[in-house]
Amino acid sequence: MELVLKDAQSALEVSETTFGRDFNEALVHQVVVAYAANARQGTRAQKTRAEVVGSGKKPWRQKGTGRARAGTVKGPIWRGGGVTFAAKAQDHSQKVNKKMYRGALKSIFSELVRQDRLVVVESFGVEAPKTKELKAKLNEMQLEDVLIVTPEVDENLFLAARNLYKVDVRDVAGIDPVSLIAFNKVLVTAEAIKQIEEMLG
């Protein structure tokens, strides 16, 4: 199959297994959920009454003081005491096989092509790290909500895009399922397309 280059009167020959396969919604959903889960920190932790540091001594005698009876200063009803059903650190990570991950990316790229959301160009960049210059180029191409994918990290492009709303720049190694579906358009250079095909096999 062929992808038409937006900035040239030519087309790029690409693999149908990467850019023309059926959309596997269940697989994409599973991989996106796993990706989001793996980003969770999961370090929240509180102490139970057993873990709070302090004396185990009865604060005052059982009878005769006129105060409510108390057996410990570490109970949940005391200030500085333990927490009932305290939250503990959890590992939220989910395992995703390489084959599944690659399959999900292929499904996403194929769906982007079908929905006309994948914009392929011969090359893309800015001469200086100027937001104004990048904004003008994107306006010329009628692109606003866009993920720009380049073969390698382009510092000028990265710095120019940093202050633009709904514009992100990634190299091929930095793309992920969530970013690909989060933006309205994905702008990819011809060289990046070749690298994506090599990466996904």
From Swiss-Prot:
Q: Which GO terms describe its biological process?
A: translation
Cellular component per GO?
ribonucleoprotein complex; ribosome
Q: According to its UniProt record, what is one Pfam family this protein matches? A: Ribosomal_L4
**Region annotation (Disordered) ranges:** 46-71
GO MF annotation list: rRNA binding; structural constituent of ribosome
The leader peptide range reads: none
Q: Does the keyword Ribonucleoprotein apply?
A: yes
Query: What keywords are annotated for this sequence in UniProt?
Result: Ribonucleoprotein, Ribosomal protein, RNA-binding, rRNA-binding
Q: Which SUPFAM superfamilies match?
A: Ribosomal protein L4 (SSF52166)
Function statement: One of the primary rRNA binding proteins, this protein initially binds near the 5'-end of the 23S rRNA. It is important during the early stages of 50S assembly. It makes multiple contacts with different domains of the 23S rRNA in the assembled 50S subunit and ribosome.
Query: What quaternary structure, including any partners, is listed in this protein's UniProt entry?
Result: Part of the 50S ribosomal subunit.
Name the protein family: Belongs to the universal ribosomal protein uL4 family.
Which HAMAP family does the record associate with it?
Answer: Ribosomal_uL4_B
NCBIfam families linked to this entry: rplD_bact
Its recorded name reads Large ribosomal subunit protein uL4
The protein's gene is named rplD
